[in-house]
């Protein structure tokens, strides 16, 4: 059995930066000062194995500013948080360490600038995703969220307001382009389009498409709560390539690959290298 591993599999820049910031806090407490409690506001990334490792090191997770004690070090998750929540955390007397992905922060800034001009946001994203909740907080002139073209077509969008289009940073680029063309046809040149999908996401999705076309079966590794990982699995399904989405190598068995000569391996942006390496090791043993 031949194995092909995606070069883009594993941590993206934003995840890597966030985890390095958290690791620095754990490994280098202030000299001659009592250790401060360290918490993340929401899961710092969407990977249960990483979260378990940090929990074992004493890093807590909070989801409500009211639960934060004064003096606590609060690390903002890579997905970002709503602006009012950030202010509420500061009001609790916490020390804030911002680990928001730079690409997410740029999207927040771009959306805020458009909203200040009175434009209404049309956001392509998962309504319940933490990144989306954060982005919406900057759309102070109004917003509509939709997860796909079907949901968009059902929205009541009168021609009075001036709209602008943006996307969750990990959304599907090809679907976004279809949505852009549909909205331009509907609203004309008055529609402002923001480029907020991360380049790393686009590259990862393109490589997954190429890999799906070159293999008989594709293994996608990453947390089941990870939106970008789920979209990689969707790429394989759209290509008609048999696939499986797993979190760890423990979910594999030789019988899954009976009759397949070439296996592809890719992983989401929040999947640690050691987990991908272990999956590769197990696959190569079959």
Swiss-Prot record:
Pfam families: LYTB (PF02401)
GO molecular function: 4 iron, 4 sulfur cluster binding; 4-hydroxy-3-methylbut-2-enyl diphosphate reductase activity; metal ion binding
Residues engaged in binding [4Fe-4S] cluster: 12, 101, 198
Cofactor(s) for this UniProt protein: [4Fe-4S] cluster
HAMAP family, A to Z: IspH
Function: Catalyzes the conversion of 1-hydroxy-2-methyl-2-(E)-butenyl 4-diphosphate (HMBPP) into a mixture of isopentenyl diphosphate (IPP) and dimethylallyl diphosphate (DMAPP). Acts in the terminal step of the DOXP/MEP pathway for isoprenoid precursor biosynthesis.
Protein known as: 4-hydroxy-3-methylbut-2-enyl diphosphate reductase
Organism this protein belongs to: Solidesulfovibrio magneticus (strain ATCC 700980 / DSM 13731 / RS-1) (Desulfovibrio magneticus)
Gene name of this polypeptide: ispH
């Amino acid at each position: 059995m031949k194995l092909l591993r995606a070069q883009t599999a594993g941590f993206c820049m934003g995840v890597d930066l966030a985890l390095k910031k958290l690791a620095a806090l754990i490994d280098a407490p202030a000299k001659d000062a009592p250790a401060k409690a360290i918490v993340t506001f929401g899961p710092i990334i969407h990977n249960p194995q990483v979260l378990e490792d940090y929990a074992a090191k004493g890093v807590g997770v909070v989801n409500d500013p009211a639960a934060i004690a004064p003096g606590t070090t609060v690390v903002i998750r890579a997905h970002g948080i709503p602006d009012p929540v950030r202010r509420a955390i500061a009001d609790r007397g916490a020390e804030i360490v911002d680990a928001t992905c730079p690409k997410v922060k740029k999207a927040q800034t771009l959306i805020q600038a458009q909203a200040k001009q009175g434009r209404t946001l049309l956001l392509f994203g998962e309504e319940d995703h933490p990144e989306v909740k954060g982005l919406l907080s900057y759309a102070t002139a109004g917003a509509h969220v939709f997860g796909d073209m079907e949901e968009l077509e059902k929205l009541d969008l009168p021609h009075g307001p001036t709209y602008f289009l943006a996307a969750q940073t990990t959304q599907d680029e090809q679907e976004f382009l279809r949505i852009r063309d549909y909205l331009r046809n509907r609203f004309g040149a008055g529609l402002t389009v923001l480029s907020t999908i991360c380049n790393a996401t686009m590259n990862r999705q393109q490589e997954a498409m190429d890999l799906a076309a070159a293999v008989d079966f594709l293994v996608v590794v990453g947390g089941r709560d990870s939106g970008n990982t789920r979209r990689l699995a969707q790429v394989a399904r759209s290509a008609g390539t048999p696939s499986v989405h797993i979190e760890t190598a423990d979910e594999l068995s030789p019988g899954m690959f009976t009759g397949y000569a070439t296996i592809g391996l890719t992983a989401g942006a929040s999947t640690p290298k050691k987990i991908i390496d272990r999956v590769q090791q197990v696959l190569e043993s079959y």
